[in-house]
Amino acid sequence: MKITKIEKKKRLYLLELDDSEKLYITEDTIVHFMLSRGMEITDQELSEIQDYAQFSYGKNLALYHLSFKQRTTKEVKDYLTRHDIQPETISQVLDNLKKDNWVNDRKYANSFIQSNLLTGDKGTFVLKQKLTQKGISSTIIEEELSQFDFTELTDKVAEKLLKKYQGKLPSKALQDKLLQSLINKGFSYSQAKTAYQHLDIEEDQENQEELLYKELDKQYRKYSKKYDGYDLKQRLTQALARKGYDYSDISSVLRDYF
């Protein structure tokens, strides 16, 4: 069969044969097979051209996707699947991209962790979760995480949280809040506890007392509608204790309050 036309159509080329068959191919395919109008090709050569065109198109799509930022194997695979590239072609494309180091899950994980240490605020557990969602194996994740020390980051995040909550919570509640916030960000309890111990927390007794009285007023308005006497004091004591206030401080303000 003979090639009767090769015509550029945006990013692809339309190739027509004298048996009326048409197919879209990439410029790489034309160069690879040195195709030209009037060229005779066999059925076997046509099949090879079709396979290569699909591979070349898939690779071009992947490179376009990678041109914006680094991607994992899973991200590239999902992108090609959404663009109807066949599974066997996707495997070929990924093998080619990995060989040329366009896709490297280990390198991606390393960069992801470094970026978080420089500008992020997440601990190892959250990073593991995020990298796992991106399709990176647990082995690679663990090996890359083991290369980094999160002490400085944990301390930095703890300092930031302290600035946010200090003066707004009683001492015990402040400690609980800081520890829980650090754990929620993916740091281990041990890391959170150590970071908390590194903090320079100034106890402002006057502020603590002011917070306690303010909370007592709030709880009194709530419970005095239903309770009085001993029952009211018990309700207030329990409510204030749940807020993180010390029992001795609660007893002291209740004596002044009633």
From Swiss-Prot:
<dbReference type="Pfam" id="PF02631">
    <property type="entry name" value="RecX_HTH2"/>
</dbReference>
<keyword id="KW-0963">Cytoplasm</keyword>
<dbReference type="InterPro" id="IPR053926">
    <property type="entry name" value="RecX_HTH_1st"/>
</dbReference>
<protein>
    <recommendedName>
        <fullName>Regulatory protein RecX</fullName>
    </recommendedName>
</protein>
<comment type="similarity">
    <text>Belongs to the RecX family.</text>
</comment>
<dbReference type="InterPro" id="IPR053925">
    <property type="entry name" value="RecX_HTH_3rd"/>
</dbReference>
<dbReference type="Pfam" id="PF21981">
    <property type="entry name" value="RecX_HTH3"/>
</dbReference>
<dbReference type="InterPro" id="IPR036388">
    <property type="entry name" value="WH-like_DNA-bd_sf"/>
</dbReference>
<dbReference type="Pfam" id="PF21982">
    <property type="entry name" value="RecX_HTH1"/>
</dbReference>
<dbReference type="GO" id="GO:0005737">
    <property type="term" value="C:cytoplasm"/>
</dbReference>
<dbReference type="GO" id="GO:0006282">
    <property type="term" value="P:regulation of DNA repair"/>
</dbReference>
<dbReference type="InterPro" id="IPR053924">
    <property type="entry name" value="RecX_HTH_2nd"/>
</dbReference>
<comment type="function">
    <text>Modulates RecA activity.</text>
</comment>
<dbReference type="InterPro" id="IPR003783">
    <property type="entry name" value="Regulatory_RecX"/>
</dbReference>
